[in-house]
């Protein structure tokens, strides 16, 4: 393998470092396969549930609550498990559990789609059992996907880019996020095509078959990356020894009441570690952005449909929104090179805030021109994706750089748990404010939370840099303008 010093070349100018570039491509392909299966299921499960229980969003809402609750409650534990196990152990556990969960969910959904009506009429317990299997399998798939995300995005990427210029880590992060957003854009298109022109039952069976076949390819790709970068095995061994030492030290200490209480609450220690980090404010600010209806999710899509916007228009707007998000993965490296990670995040979050002003204006435009209001809402949300995903990349890199290696997995688990908690609150608010005519209230609430997130991040920037603007550069320019 080429030396690590050549790693920056393929990311920055496309030359040299052929072996490292090939290994990175394997990492990207493996990540693509994992995200593609997850995004297909994420899009399709709502359609499956509506078909199984026509005329009601009950099963869809219950599934969303179960999945979000599982990640919110168990996310810190997943992070702690990833931190304690060797990289290959986590890899095997992730891929095995994710593949088995998606296969089980696909099989149970297929059975519900084919036999659901008969089961509900003849044997309701069997119907409920299949729904429970689908929900539990989906929750397990989400937890295993979280483990894989922490392993690849929080650990492997940082280790691979270790000792390289900051632009290398920025480049890898951007490609990883670009893959995720591309899957978010294209996987629903393929799934929708399959459902519309073949059948929903066939799409569920194909989803199970895809995950069964893809898991072996993913394993081979990731193992080859692990073997190709010696730093990964070295870091894994160091982390494992540190975990063993911590266990031995804990066993040698007397079992005080406080330690027993901490054992009963395994998440508490993870949250305490998270709260001690220097980057806790950016992390909480990012989590606030998940408590929102200002995205092409279930609530906003349903409201647009209620307002009479055709489904194909909504899907095109969603595609434009995803394309803007993908563009953010190209813009962010350039912005990072000019203004640093911290300032790139500051400009990004306030750019998102400015775009969402159009969405707030749509609330007051709705009474006089409902169609124009809907277009303003879609346009504002789509434009805001540039700032949103640039901010996401900035916070992710701040955490990669600012969190100690020993805490990285735990912090990643808590961060995802916190984001899922706010995502869950969005579902709760949708239940409380369920009338589409009151959707404007949810828009204003979402905008308020984005404002809070921007304020928190601005406080962090001021705390670190001791200033927000270079007044020594701005004032001379103002004096020059006044003099002219």
Curated annotation (Swiss-Prot):
GO biological process terms held by the UniProt record: iron ion transport
Keywords: Ion transport, Membrane, Transmembrane, Transmembrane helix, Transport
An annotated GO cellular component: membrane
Record bears the keyword Hydrolase: no
Membrane topology, record value: Multi-pass membrane protein
UniProt-listed InterPro entries: Ferroportin-1 (IPR009716), MFS_trans_sf (IPR036259)
Annotated TM spans: 58-78, 94-114, 123-143, 189-209, 212-232, 279-299, 308-328, 346-366, 377-397, 413-433, 442-462
Keyword Membrane: yes
Domain of life according to the entry: Eukaryota
Compartments (UniProt record): Membrane
GO MF terms held by the record: iron ion transmembrane transporter activity
Pfam families: FPN1
Family: Belongs to the ferroportin (FP) (TC 2.A.100) family. SLC40A subfamily.
Function, in words: May be involved in iron transport and iron homeostasis.
Protein name, UniProt field: Solute carrier family 40 member 1
Organism: Oryza sativa subsp. japonica (Rice)
Taxonomic lineage of the native organism: Eukaryota, Viridiplantae, Streptophyta, Embryophyta, Tracheophyta
């Amino acid at each position: 393998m080429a030396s690590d010093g050549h790693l920056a070349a393929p990311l920055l100018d496309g030359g040299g470092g052929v072996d490292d570039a090939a290994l990175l491509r394997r990492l990207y392909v493996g990540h693509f396969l994992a995200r593609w299966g997850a995004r297909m299921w994420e899009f399709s499960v709502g359609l499956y549930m509506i078909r199984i229980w026509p005329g009601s969003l009950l099963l869809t809402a219950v599934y969303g609550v179960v999945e979000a609750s599982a990640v919110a409650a168990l996310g810190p534990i997943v992070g702690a498990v990833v931190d304690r196990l060797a990289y290959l152990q986590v890899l095997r556990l992730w891929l095995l559990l994710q593949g088995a969960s998606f296969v089980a969910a696909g099989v149970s959904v297929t059975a519900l789609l084919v036999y659901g009506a008969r089961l509900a009429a003849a044997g309701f317990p069997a119907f409920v059992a299949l729904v429970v299997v689908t929900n539990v399998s989906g929750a397990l798939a989400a937890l295993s996907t979280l483990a894989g995300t922490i392993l690849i995005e929080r650990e492997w990427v940082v280790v691979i880019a270790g000792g390289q210029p900051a632009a290398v880590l920025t480049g890898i992060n951007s490609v990883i996020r670009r893959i995720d957003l591309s899957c978010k854009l294209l996987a629903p298109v393929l799934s929708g095509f399959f459902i519309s022109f073949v059948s929903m039952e066939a799409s569920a069976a194909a989803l199970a078959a895809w995950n069964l076949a893809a898991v072996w390819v993913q394993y081979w790709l990731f193992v080859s990356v692990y073997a190709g970068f010696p730093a990964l095995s070295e870091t894994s061994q160091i982390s494992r020894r540190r975990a063993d030492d911590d266990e031995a030290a804990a066993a040698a200490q007397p079992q005080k009441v406080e330690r027993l209480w901490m054992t009963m609450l395994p998440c508490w220690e993870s949250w305490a570690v998270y709260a001690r980090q220097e980057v806790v404010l950016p992390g909480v600010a990012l989590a606030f952005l998940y408590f929102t209806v200002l995205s092409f999710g279930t609530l906003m899509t349903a409201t647009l449909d209620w307002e009479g916007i055709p489904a194909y228009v909504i899907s095109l707007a969603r595609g434009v929104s995803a394309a803007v998000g993908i563009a953010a993965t190209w813009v962010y490296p350039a912005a990072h090179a000019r203004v640093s990670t911290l300032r790139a995040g500051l400009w990004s979050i306030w750019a998102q805030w400015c775009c969402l002003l159009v969405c707030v204006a749509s609330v007051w435009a709705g009474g006089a021109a409902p169609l124009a209001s809907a277009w303003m809402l879609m346009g504002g949300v789509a434009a805001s994706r540039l700032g949103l995903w640039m901010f996401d990349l900035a916070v992710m890199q701040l955490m990669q750089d600012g969190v100690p290696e020993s805490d990285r997995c735990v912090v990643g688990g808590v961060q995802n748990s916190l984001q899922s908690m706010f995502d869950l609150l969005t579902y709760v608010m949708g239940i409380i404010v369920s009338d589409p005519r009151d959707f404007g209230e949810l828009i204003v609430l979402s905008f308020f939370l984005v404002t809070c997130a921007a304020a928190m991040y601005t406080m962090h920037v001021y705390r670190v840099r001791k200033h927000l603007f270079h007044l020594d550069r701005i004032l001379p320019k103002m004096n020059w303008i006044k003099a002219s």
